[in-house]
Amino acid sequence: MWLSLLAGPWRLVNGLLATRVELRKAERALTSGANKEARLATLKGSAAAEQARGAFEAPAPLLDLAMVSAQVRDALPEMGHVVNAVEHSAQAARSTLRIGQNALKGPYKLIDQDPDDPDSKKIRIERLVAVGELISEVRRAVQSVEDELTAVDAMALPRSLRDGIARSIEKARSTDRTLSDAEDGFAILPDVLGGNGRRIYFLAIQNSAELRGTGGSLLQFQLMQFENGRPRLLKERSGSIYKIDQDRRQLSIPLPEDAWYVAGIDDAKRAGNANWSPDWPLSARLTVAYSEAGARASGAPWPAVDGVIGVDPEVLKRLLPGIGRPGAGTDFKLTPANIVDYVLYKAYASFPIPGIRRQRLSYLVDGFYESLFNPAHPTELIPGLGRALSEKHMQIWLERPNEQKFIEKMNWDGGIEDAPGSDYLYIVEQNVGGNKLDYFDEQTNSMNIRLKGRDALVSTEVRIYNGALAPLPRYVYGNSGPLHRPMINLYAQGDAELIGAHMVKGRRLEASPTAELAAWNGNHPPEHFELGKKVWSTTLEIPPQEDAAVRFDYRVPGVVRKVGDHSVYRLTVQHQPKVRPETLEVRLQLPPGAGGVVAPGWTRSGDTLMWARPLVKDMILEVKWRG
């Protein structure tokens, strides 16, 4: 009799707990690419959800008896919402499993042999559409989970369960936001891949041993065509940027107001040197405009370009585990640990004759990007691609506004952030020595911040170390011998006011790249506005194994905000992708009487907060206090 009384409640509780455990297992298994384990856990979770539903709806004498208690009587009606939420979670898991199992393998996979060219791959547009529909199905199930849990009267539940309901609601909302991004991405992807007409993209290959605003000098390019999901590198029209910039010819095109560097530097008026602004959309549009102008000037045909994708050698490192080892035209064994060094340095020593070196590197790069659509380990490709995008080693500009809107939403655009209600820092280095010494460059940015009322008084020091060991080959030294000549550009909020700038150590140049862009007026360096930001610039000259440093002192008005009973200081930091990530050190002096300080990620010593680490991603730092 007692077993009969206990059976109903036990099946209900056991079903709910088992569903949660198994669906968590399924999530972890799918994330790691373990599809068999994910399938088993999903089936178990679905069965457990059915068990919970059956137990909830079946007669249960013990539950009837427990209804005498007011606490149980109040809580039990809420269990219907919980059981509904569990069933919707299982439904979402089943649909997610279908995506995970079918996207990369089997008859429904996204990438398959091209029936018109058995040696090539094709992205199946109809399967992209089907996966997009499945994502929408998953999202609807997740939204139903949120709806059911939000309908629960948490106060009717035991206190021990309330936090779990709140966490589950937040998890559902977070998942819904992620699925919204995926839904938007799959909505534009068929068009981006040529499902409704041919698309051509300009793959801008940047050399980060010679820095430009977006991450490196644009020395090589590929035109990549997509037609109905079929990718093809247009090799005969790709290669050295000097196929476009014949004789480094400088061209005249209408320049936007924010193209300050290009307007002031004659050699920047061409496709391969127009990326001085760190804002990828601006630099990408200039690159396309100069490419078109160069084609017109030479009478050569040039296709309508639908977007520009910027990449640097770090992309090879991030994607190599998924792609597999490409041929390099050498016995040198390429791995994620050495491929960047090979491309930027060791290949120069292995092939000192420029023509042979370019041929070998071109062979490597062609093979690499062709393998993107026939990867050896597809499940390892996605996380590598995500990391390359988040670290700005890959940046995207698409010509169509609706597609670019999605890229911006995902923060894949490499654009200068608006950062409203926030202090702002972006240190951008340009190589004006015509060399490859940024391969040895180490940069440390140190901010000291003192808050005065609603304003921030900031001192930012930029220190560059030239780690080159002389002597080095001519192809590394370039035009300036062993002397490293980095142009430093500090981007601050548009209403920031410069108090003064000072050389802390070393030598600065007054006429490099030009006097207008480098010469100081007293203790004020050149200043310009760019995309809502104020920028101060100077150029250093640094011998091997030495460093140089410059400090900018400025005031940022109105940057401390009041939110409820807290004062809030927020700092938006953007980073320039480099071979060796810059280090950021921040010291913030708390106002007198500050209490209840909330400063995630900071360490505290007395009234000073400190934050220091290598900067590989754009980020936001925030401090809250009372008083």
Which ranges hold each PLM region?
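Non-catalytic accessory/assembly modules
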Residues: 8-217, 221-223, 358, 378-417
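A generic structural signal for well-ordered alpha-helical segments enriched in polar/charged residues
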Residues: 28, 47, 51, 289, ...
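Hydrophobic membrane-insertion alpha-helices, especially the h-region
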Residues: 1-5
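Flexible, acidic/glycine-enriched loop-and-adjacent beta/alpha segments
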Residues: 58, 62-91, 98-100, 298-367, ...
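A conserved hydrophobic secondary-structure block that centers on an alpha-helix together
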Residues: 33, 40, 270-314, 318
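Lumenal/extracellular ectodomains and adaptor appendage modules
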Residues: 190-205, 210-216, 225, 231-285, ...
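Conserved beta-strand and immediately adjacent loop positions that scaffold enzyme active sites
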Residues: 220-222, 307, 487
